[in-house]
Amino acid sequence: MLEVTDLYGNSEPLTNHSILENNFEINTVPDLNFTVYRKYNERAFDMITEKCVITEVESKEMYRIEMFSCIGSGDTIGYNVQCLHIVKDLNNKLLTSELKGSQTIKSCMDFIVSGTKFTYEILDSFSSFDFESLGNDFALNVLLNNILVNFKAEFEVTNYHIVIRKKIGIENAFIF
């Protein structure tokens, strides 16, 4: 089941939605796509707007609505909804300064999460990396395109908590 939380903090359950499509790939922002119809969700349906939070009730994972489009008409009006994981909120932080020289992965993570709701854990050891320049971009972009690449690390996320490892999961794992 899903729950929608509007920009004012009001929440309502979303029922009778389509089969969820979740995409999880290493070092990318997970997404969630679903279809929902007004006749089954009158109160919640009117709360759906861009940037609202959709929570998967079972896993408690939170996603932010990035885009939705209207489908059907009359009694069968609905929305196709596309969401990105709440970790996308890291891109609300513009890093206007830079780190230079030899940096640990911890100093880099401190740099990108400072002043945000995000926390992190580093579960493996990593050598320092010598940066010409790290920053002057959005925090999530720096994580995905610089920190993870240069430290040869992978991440997984549970809402506002990021876990950094050398390897997430096992190779040749079968995902249902």
Question: Language-model segments: which ranges?
Answer:
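Juxtamembrane "anchor/assembly" segments of surface/extracellular structural proteins
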Residues: 1-47, 84-88, 153
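Short beta-strand-centered interaction patches in the first periplasmic/extracellular domains
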Residues: 69-90, 124-176
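Solvent-exposed, flexible loop/coil residues
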Residues: 18, 94, 133
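A generic structural signal for short, solvent-exposed coil/turn residues
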Residues: 12, 26, 46, 57, ...
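Surface-exposed cap/loop segments at beta↔alpha junctions
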Residues: 41-120
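Ser/Thr- (and often Asn-) enriched beta-sheet segments in non-cytosolic proteins
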Residues: 1-5, 11-13, 33-35, 53-55, ...
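Amphipathic, non-transmembrane alpha-helical segments in extracytoplasmic/periplasmic proteins
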Residues: 25, 33-34, 83, 97-120, ...
